[in-house]
Amino acid sequence: MRISKQGADFIKSFEGCRLEAYHGAADRPGLYTIGYGHTGKVQKGQKITQAEADKLFSNDVAPIEKQLTADVPNVSQHQFDALVSFCFNLGVSAYMGSTLRRKLKAGDKLGAAAEFSKWCRANGKVVTGLQRRRNAERAMFLQSGFVDLAVIMVIFMVIGFVLLMHVD
């Protein structure tokens, strides 16, 4: 399977695109990111074009598509897109060892969907942006078809705002 245009746009909307290499606050020393979350062989100060960012994204997604297609060949397009987003953000190795995968392989798609929300932490703390992304991935996974991406984003922005208002 291949990620759909809607799935790719979904990932890109959460990742954002930076055409100059940067070091994220949670990144290990010496790790730089460029484009749509690309971290391979990126040098401090490196710059790329939008076309190069799009190519890096396609190259980064391809091995995820291949591994997921082999691992779970009988998922719908929206389920596949949600899984690609999950793996793109967390890494295929996190998915391979996850309860989400075990439940999906056992045919428990509702149980698998519930597992998305357990992957919202960075450095031991719940991150609102990760909550929004996992909630959106779960919603995508459970859909029988794509709702307009803008509608999904607005819904989860509102949910995120409500969550922020209730944080101590």
Residue ranges and their predicted role:
Residues 87-92:
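Short alpha-helix boundary/capping elements
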Residues 1-29, 38-43, 47-69, 93-168:
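Long, amphipathic alpha-helical surface segments
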